[in-house]
Amino acid sequence: MIAKPFTPMNNHLIMLYRLDSQNAEYNTENSNVKFRPVSKRFIDCFQNGEDTTDVRYAFSINKKRQGIKPIFCGIRAAEFKFMEAESYYHLGKQDEALKSLNELRALRIDGVKPYTMETLPEAPKSDLITTDCDGKPLTKLLAAILNERHKEFFLEGDRFFELKRNGGPEYWVAYNGRKYTNFHYMYTLPIPEVDIHTTKGMIQNPGYTELEY
């Protein structure tokens, strides 16, 4: 876990060079997070009473449902543990994938009992991800791996890419009385207009030419 976002710890392999306490933009965004209630979708990740036993909950959310975890951009050792678990899964080595998942959970959740194939929980009903990177419906094991990943990398810039590589689900959020929809095509960003105008044959990515401003 990240205790001091500005000081490299033992499991910080790479840190963004702009991540320092003198960066006004970083401090502004870190302050703004506290004015945005944490989504129920994220809270639902902590199943079966784990909101009181999982250290990530207390580190991420306060009693007012505000995000209190410092924004972070970098690579931690936990990232490789999740890569290991998911790689084992996609190679068909489910026992090894489950073992990797249990090893990480044991470091995060007080008194946790290891999952077995029989005790794996259902995926949270509110979760946006329902298919894997191959478009196949999630199994309980993969859903558990992705659920733990969601908890682990909250406010670390990971979620967008998780959604993108696992089906690119469409969803909407409300803000100031308006509904904002994240459409599937938006997982691929638009090409800047200046590049299209100055590069012969350059075509805008699908979806953006139909937008009305």
Question: What residues fall within each predicted segment?
Answer:
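Acidic/polar-rich alpha-helix caps and helix-coil junctions
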Residues: M1-A24, D44-Y213
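Aromatic (Trp/Tyr) and acidic
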Residues: N32
